[in-house]
A protein has these predicted regions:
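Extreme N-terminal, non-catalytic leader segments
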Residues: 1-58
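Short, well-ordered alpha-helices that flank and scaffold nucleotide-derived cofactor binding pockets
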Residues: 72, 76, 152, 179
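Residue-level signature of catalytic and energy-coupling elements of molecular machines
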Residues: 48, 59, 85, 93, ...
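Conserved catalytic-core segment of NTP-binding enzymes
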Residues: 160-226
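Phosphate-binding loop that captures ATP/GTP phosphates
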Residues: 80-82, 86-133, 137, 144, ...
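Short glycine/serine/threonine-rich phosphate/pyrophosphate-binding segments
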Residues: 61-69, 90-94, 169-174, 196-200
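Phosphate-binding/switch loop-helix module in NTP-utilizing enzymes
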Residues: 129-177
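Walker A/P-loop phosphate-binding motif and the immediately C-terminal alpha-helix
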Residues: 51-88, 201, 205
């Protein structure tokens, strides 16, 4: 009497030997892509000597102006510098760098930054928009995925400094960058003399302490207007 074949079942209810379902295949591909991007971010982080985060607790205090000025000042001293504009919904760095209308170049799956004055390399969401009036209406997970792509899929090359310009507030964006890029050197906090701006800057300092990222300095912008 012939023995009955033994059939085993996978956790999703399918028989072994059938191969992964379409959903499982997508999950595996997504997990592999995330793992590969994480490794790429770590490798890129090792090629960048210094990484500086520029934050503000409140909008309209001149944070992007400070980021751009800091990057250009470092470039004037002979350093290789890049600016990563993480403000997905309000990217202003390309306009300040005279790079309006530029587009990013992609080669062999790697994004090449635009180059501005003094050779400063720039990555920004603005380069992907049809025009400056186009809004970016994305939910959090999509924004965070774009940020990780801006870090892991960009060919920054060897940099002395990467200046990272964030949107106002202490939301997911700085947390994502701090977790994605190893060895952040420090944070520059931009504020104005108004009481509400100073209150928000104190929140930014507390936020930096929670990330264990040292505060390099606090810039009081527009102090001559009070």
């Amino acid at each position: 009497m012939a023995e009955s074949p033994i059939t085993t079942f996978t956790p999703n209810g399918g028989q072994s030997g059938e191969g992964p379902t379409v959903q499982q295949q997508k999950q595996m591909e997504s997990a592999y892509a995330n793992m590969r991007r994480k490794m790429a971010m770590q490798e890129i982080g090792r090629k960048i000597k210094h990484k500086i985060m520029v934050l503000s607790g409140k909008g309209g205090v001149g944070k992007s102006t400070v980021s751009t000025g800091l990057a250009l000042s470092l470039a004037q001293q002979g350093h290789a510098v890049g600016i990563l504009d993480i403000d997905i919904t309000g990217p202003n760095v390309p306009k300040m760098m005279g790079l309006e209308g530029k587009r990013l170049h992609v080669e062999q799956g790697r994004i090449h930054p635009a180059q501005g004055h003094l050779g400063v390399k720039v990555i920004s969401m603005a380069f992907l928009l049809e025009d400056e009036d186009t809004p970016v209406v994305w939910r959090g997970p999509i924004k965070l995925g774009a940020i990780q792509q801006f870090i892991g899929d960009v060919e920054w090359g060897e940099l002395d400094y990467l200046v990272i310009d964030f949107p106002p507030g202490t939301s997911d964006e700085p947390l994502t960058v701090a977790q994605s890029l190893p060895d952040i050197d420090g944070m520059v906090i931009v504020t104005t003399p108004q009481d509400v701006a100073l209150l928000d800057s104190r929140k930014s300092i507390t936020f930096s302490e929670s990330l264990k990222v040292p505060v390099l300095g606090v810039v009081e912008n527009m102090s001559g207007y009070t």
